[in-house]
Curated annotation (Swiss-Prot):
Changing residue 556 to R: In SPGF84; uncertain significance. InterPro entries: CFAP61, CFAP61_dimer, CFAP61_N, FAD/NAD-bd_sf. It is linked to Spermatogenic failure 84: An autosomal recessive male infertility disorder characterized by multiple morphologic abnormalities of the sperm flagella, resulting in severely reduced motility. Some patients also have a reduced sperm count. Coiled coil: none annotated. Component of axonemal radial spokes, the protein complexes that link the outer microtubule doublets with the central pair of microtubules. Interacts with CFAP91/MAATS1, ODAD2/ARMC4, RSPH3A, ROPN1, ROPN1L and RSPH9. Interacts with DYNLT1, DYNC1I2 and TUBB3. Interacts with WDR35, IFT22 and IFT81. It comes from Homo sapiens (Human). GO terms for cellular component: axoneme; motile cilium; sperm flagellum. Residues 278-301 are annotated as: Disordered. The gene is CFAP61. Residues 281-290 have a biased composition (Basic and acidic residues). Keywords: Cell projection, Cilium, Cytoplasm, Cytoskeleton, Disease variant, Flagellum. This is Cilia- and flagella-associated protein 61.
Length: 1237
């Protein structure tokens, strides 16, 4: 906050922020004729879209006082966008302007009364936001004066001609030192104590309490050759302090952190041991296999596709991805021998050997797999330490953006050191200084509660130059990428660029190199993005850009990016220069699923990019399933409707190049890859303005979505339609989340770590428990059926836990890996041709499993569906028509059903492994079945190991883990969600649990609750009133289940969250509403819609022998029946005989569009707004009629309709609807609008 005073003495409290799209109207209102003469006639939206930095100044009422826009190339066309440096160097050789330290002002507007103060405040903010910036140029016609405002901050340096017409333009310059100067750094003196202590006390009092009031003076006095204290000063006053020491505990750092890329922070020594002989031989064989030809990588893929165990597959895939990420981040740190300017001492060689390095972003790219027997080779460095450390650092908040000014001086104090390190508690918010450091990745076994940051002396160089690659750069690039798995692909693209500048198919190709001191330290290869229509229609790219303001050729597809980690802090600058030099405005980077990335040397293989954390992940868009045959020529183009290989999309553009992200280093551990856990992670990952460095998932089988089962195969388990394999590919959570494969067996709340089954520990700051409930191995009652016992005579074993060895042919299917194991067992043991299969349970998964077995070729006569007594009167399908059709299909297939049967014994009470027979009791007489394979789908429960871990940790557990309405357990650091949990008894709502709601919505709400801890842009959470504190939240998302049932019936059931109640009881209620049914369940044409008393769609049930677009039907939930083309009236008039056909008609496709909800909100906002001064809004009129404040002579509906049609509201609604259709015409070309009819 700053205070501006006008010449008249008026005062305004102002602050700066990034310009937003809604500012455009106010910016236009501040433009004067003089503004147009200075800057030209501008399209403000277009200018903001292409700007690198746009700053708005607001007062405390959020009224816009001023705005300025800056780009990285000059306006008025006085120089080419990609070649302005030489022009401005010739103008004044004393101004060392470079693309790194220069911006150009393309617009400035302000409220006249405060314009001078606004201008200075904006410039100070810009220089603070961009520490590398030293010069801002302003170019205006030479005949124009700058006016009374700009002339106070800009000085003319010369004239320059225009390239397109004969006119000269005056060049003015604004220097950093006039607004936010570099800090003077010197050795500390004792007299600095009084200046510095208030700054220290502002942040922390622990040092004073621990070491006494004069600890700082004592530290300054204790300086020697190994310890130095330095300060930065402004006008003779110390405003910052840094204490550095040459003594570093290298042994501890080598034990805890992977320091491979920097040679262990040591000088090279002949006796260094950089790799074990075994690893060396393995690496050589891998290199020969992977780099010789694409056949080698194909071989790996084929091996992965063989029927191996899921555990083995996860480990293989994780290791391949991890090695690729390690080698990518290595990027040629053999950039030793960098010849430096005279003011920096020549660097020693940096030897990487064969050490592997996981950069922050690279670590996120690879799954962190804990193998069963982890064996880690640690390099041994025998050379002297090449690092010094920062022991204490503090700086006044006003000057923290200049923190890096310390580094030149402290490196001069240690002329024999190449590295500066600092260790910080990992919860320390990321401050300006460490944003320039490289965060090192700890080893899996590291328990140090500190993060290590490293900065290399060469990182101080400002002479980095980004340019197009040339043929002479090839040796330097080869040296840079020699350790990359994809080096062959990069070098091939570079060679293609040098020879033809394009691909054989004509796609434009561009290659850029980053050069420091005549050495190549970075390489990037981009192509023109040819699938931009597909990207626009399948990804929410318009969250970041106004698509219409970007030309087709301005979209670039980044294929390769590698940068020496020493210069990691120049990554954004590298990306910015790629956009400027390549005449691009947007860059896209694709991450393909692992199965595709495994083919390292093929067209789909992109090099893993260390720039990933500087890009933003783009959410995929929900797609309409089009009836293409019915639409004919009105169908969307093939560029929109095609379904190529799914990939996750990452993006950057000119606006984002100077946009900082909020970094969160808190260790957030999610236990369980359930739909709730995945939804939670998805929400955090797609917060584009935030970067979570320590997201970890602990899961028995790692991330889901491995596509172990072919798409064409029947699924053993029913689906909740939260996520599918394509969704996982589109998210690419493995790019952002560390995955630990293991089971949680304990929680140490005091030490804040999770204990795994392998005795590994995973520390946490926030623990999220989403393990859900799983099918358990049933515990036989051990009743002797020879005694002819009935169910009433046997003990209830439902609460008992099976503790024996699980038989090898017994299967409880909880996730895809379990289904894959079952499938392999069926194939390897000839189950499809011989032996009985028992499916035990009464959930919907029993039906989908039976259908899968039938589809695999198992004869129905050998399948026995045994259903235990139901726990309630509500069946899993809760619809007699569907149940009857499924029962008939089971009978027709020859499947035998047994009802109310309780498992008594396996193998007549003998050793149960493997199971040869199973005995059951019933209400009448017992029976015994031969068994080759046993599937158990008894009631789900919390896994015993999970329960024991929770119970031992003293978390409150009452049949489930107890939480409050904010997901908290009795430990503030531990949250939980999903079917694992129940609400505390103080809410008096035991019937309602998270199981009643959509898992995806629960995960989203959990993430939203946690984001308030990390995101300063969110409004603070207000405490609910005392009387509302005892109410549980009610979520509105639909609860969905679906699958393929016996008879090859495709089944889908969508309903609002509710306490389960028999359908017949629901329909007997007087306010039930309407039931619309077409078709017959037994014929496979059944479609049922329940419309509630408010005329809203509340339930949808589909049963069809033909596949149907389930994702379309899910969008119908919660819609008003009139929105469905007066559904009820048409049904009553017998105009609808087939709802399947009805919802494939072209008129309804807009309902399935992902942005239709936005249109509804916009239209509602129009009706709620007062468009005419003296008249109430339509919404107010409706309330007045309801409250009987007005009594129209006609029916209320007719009255409102007449008012609507006679007022401006009708025109506004029609215009908004037509705008929606026009803007989304690539998805909705089947609709007509004025001009095409």
């Amino acid at each position: 906050m700053s205070v501006l005073t006008s010449p008249r003495g008026k005062v305004e409290v102002v602050h700066c922020r990034r310009t937003e799209s809604q500012d455009v109207y106010c910016i236009k209102s501040l433009i004067r004729k003089f503004t147009c003469k200075l800057f030209g006639k501008l399209n403000i939206i277009y200018l903001l879209e292409k700007a690198n930095l746009a700053v708005t100044l607001c007062n405390d009422k959020e009224e816009i006082m001023a705005q300025a826009t800056f780009l990285d190339y000059p306006n008025w066309n006085v120089a080419k966008q990609d070649d302005w440096v030489s022009v401005f160097r010739e103008l004044d050789s004393d101004i060392p302007c470079t693309p790194l330290n220069t911006l150009f002002m393309h617009l400035f507007v302000a409220v006249d009364e405060y314009s001078v103060g606004c201008c200075k405040e904006i410039l100070r903010t810009v220089y603070k936001a961009v520490p590398e910036l030293h010069f801002i140029f302003l170019i205006v016609p030479s005949y124009m004066s700058l006016g009374s405002t700009l002339i106070t901050v800009f000085d003319q340096v010369g004239n320059i001609p225009c390239l397109t017409y004969e006119e000269d333009f005056a060049v003015h310059i604004c220097h950093r030192h006039s607004h936010y100067p570099q800090l003077h750094v010197r050795k500390a003196r004792v007299e600095d104590h009084d200046d510095l202590m208030p700054i220290f006390m502002r942040y922390d009092t622990i040092l004073k309490e621990t070491y006494g009031e004069y600890f700082l003076a004592e530290l300054i006095e204790a300086q020697d050759e190994e310890n130095h204290a330095v300060v930065c000063e402004v006008e003779g006053t110390a405003v910052g302090f840094m204490s550095v020491c040459s003594r570093v505990n290298m042994q501890l750092l080598h034990e805890c952190f992977d320091l491979g890329p920097f040679h262990g922070l040591c000088f090279p020594h002949p006796d260094d041991v950089l790799e074990s002989p075994q690893d060396l031989s393995v690496r050589r064989s891998q290199d020969a296999e992977l780099r010789s030809s694409s056949q080698g990588s194909q071989k790996i893929v084929e091996e992965l596709q063989e029927p191996v165990s899921p555990d083995t597959m996860e480990n293989i895939q994780g290791n391949i991805a991890r090695e690729a990420a390690s080698e990518e981040a290595l990027t040629a740190v053999q950039s030793g021998n960098v010849s430096e300017p005279e003011d920096i001492e020549k660097l020693s060689d940096i030897s990487t050997g064969y050490a592997q390095y996981h950069h922050v972003s690279s670590r996120s790219l690879a799954s962190l797999v804990l193998p069963e027997e982890p064996v880690h080779f640690r390099p041994i460095y025998r050379g002297a330490s090449a690092a010094f450390c920062i022991q204490l650092f503090c700086i006044d908040e006003k000057y923290e953006a200049r923190s890096l000014d310390f580094m030149n001086f402290v490196f001069s104090l240690f002329s024999d050191k190449n590295f500066c390190v600092i260790s910080l508690p990992h919860l320390t918010p990321e401050f300006f200084l460490i944003q320039n450091f490289v965060k090192m990745v700890p080893f899996n076994t590291c328990t140090l509660e500190q993060d290590l940051y490293v900065f290399h002396r060469a990182g101080l160089l400002k002479s980095i130059n980004i340019r197009f690659a040339t043929l002479l750069d090839t040796p330097g690039v080869e040296n840079l990428v020699s350790t990359l798995m994809l080096n062959k692909s990069i070098l091939e693209d570079l060679d293609r660029y040098n020879k033809a500048r394009k691909d054989p198919d004509g796609t434009l190709l561009q290659a850029f190199v980053a050069e420091v001191a005549e050495q190549i330290v970075g390489i990037a290869v981009i192509r023109n993005e040819m699938d931009i229509e597909y990207i626009r229609s399948h990804y929410n790219i318009e969250d970041f850009i106004y698509f219409s303001h970007h030309q087709r050729e301005e979209h670039g597809h980044m294929h390769h990016f590698a940068l020496n980690p020493i210069f990691r802090h120049y990554t954004k600058f590298f990306l910015k220069e790629i956009l400027r030099l390549g005449f691009k405005s947007c860059l896209y980077y694709r991450v393909y699923p692992k199965s595709r990335e495994g083919k390292f040397q093929n067209p789909y293989a992109h090099s893993l990019t260390s720039a990933l954390h500087y890009l933003v992940p783009v959410r995929p868009r929900r797609q309409i399933v089009y009836p293409l045959e019915k639409l004919g020529i009105n169908a969307p183009s093939k560029a929109v409707s095609k379904d190529p290989m799914s990939y996750a999309l990452n993006h950057t553009n000119r606006k984002l190049t100077l946009e900082p992200k909020i970094t969160v280093n808190a260790k957030i551990i999610v236990v369980g890859a359930s739909s709730v856990g995945i939804s939670f992670l998805e929400t955090l990952v797609f917060c584009s303005h935030m970067k979570f460095n320590n997201l970890t998932l602990i899961s028995t089988h790692g991330l889901p979505g491995k596509k172990l089962l072919d798409t064409e195969q029947r699924k053993f388990l029913a689906s909740d339609h939260c996520f599918n394999d394509k969704d996982y590919a589109l998210m690419s959570l493995c790019s952002w989340v560390n995955v630990v494969v293991g089971r949680m067996t304990g929680i140490d709340r005091a030490a804040k770590h999770v204990v795994l089954s392998t005795d590994e520990i995973v520390p946490y700051d926030h623990l999220i428990l989403c393990t859900g409930q799983q099918y358990q191995v049933p515990c036989p009652t051990e009743a002797d059926i020879s005694q002819h016992l009935t169910n009433r005579e046997v003990p209830n074993s439902s609460q008992r836990r099976y503790t024996g060895k699980v038989p090898c042919n017994h299967f409880t299917l909880n996730e895809e890996e379990d289904c894959f194991k079952a499938l392999i067992w069926i194939r390897n043991n000839s189950i499809t041709t011989e032996g009985n299969i028992i499916v035990y349970g009464n959930t919907i998964d029993t039906y989908t499993t039976v259908e899968t077995l039938l589809n695999l070729g198992v004869s129905g006569s050998r399948i026995h569906l045994v259903q235990p007594p139901p726990a309630s009167t509500i069946t899993c399908i809760n619809n007699y028509s569907v149940e009857s059709a499924v029962a008939d299909a089971l009978g027709a297939a020859g499947v035998t059903m047994y009802r109310d049967a309780i498992l008594a014994q396996w193998n007549d009470g003998l050793h149960p492994d493997p199971i040869y027979s199973a005995s059951f009791t019933t209400p009448t007489k017992p029976f015994r079945l031969q068994c080759s394979m046993f599937f158990s789908f008894c009631e789900k429960n919390v896994d015993y190991e999970t329960f024991k871990a929770l119970n031992d940790a003293c978390l409150v557990y009452d049949s489930r883990l107890v939480i409050d309405t904010n997901f908290h357990t009795n430990d503030i650091a531990i949250r939980a969600a999903g079917s694992l949990t129940k609400f505390s008894n103080r809410y008096y709502s035991n019937e309602w649990t998270h199981s009643n709601f959509s898992s995806k919505e629960i995960g989203f709400q959990l993430a939203a609750a946690m984001l308030h801890l990390f995101d300063p842009t969110l409004e603070p959470v207000t405490e609910p009133p005392a009387n509302l504190d005892r109410l549980i939240p009610m979520y509105k998302g639909a609860k969905i289940q679906g699958g393929i049932l016996p008879g090859s019936y495709h089944y889908l059931h969508i309903a609002k969250p509710a306490i389960p109640t028999p359908l017949e009881v629901q329909m007997a209620q007087p306010n039930y509403g309407l039931e619309l049914v077409t078709g017959s369940a037994k014929n496979g044409t059944y479609f049922r819609i329940h419309i509630n008393k408010y005329k809203m769609v509340e339930t949808i049930t589909c049963l069809s022998r033909e596949p149907f677009p389930a994702s379309n039907y899910i969008r119908l939930f919660g819609q008003h029946e009139q929105l469905l083309n007066n559904l009820c009236a048409r049904y009553d008039e017998n105009l609808i005989t087939d709802l399947y056909s009805y919802f494939t008609e072209p008129w309804c496709l807009a309902l399935f569009h992902d942005r239709f909800i936005d249109l509804r909100k916009e239209l509602r906002q129009i009706l709620a707004s007062k468009e005419e001064e003296d008249l109430p809004s339509i919404e107010q009129l409706a309330h007045q009629i309801e409250d009987e404040e007005i009594n129209p002579t006609e029916k209320p509906r007719q009255y409102l309709k007449r008012v609507f049609e006679e007022s401006i509201y009708k025109t506004l609604v029609e215009r908004s609807t037509l705008d929606y259709l026009h803007y989304n015409r690539y998805h909705l070309p089947m609709y007509a609008w004025p001009g095409i009819v």
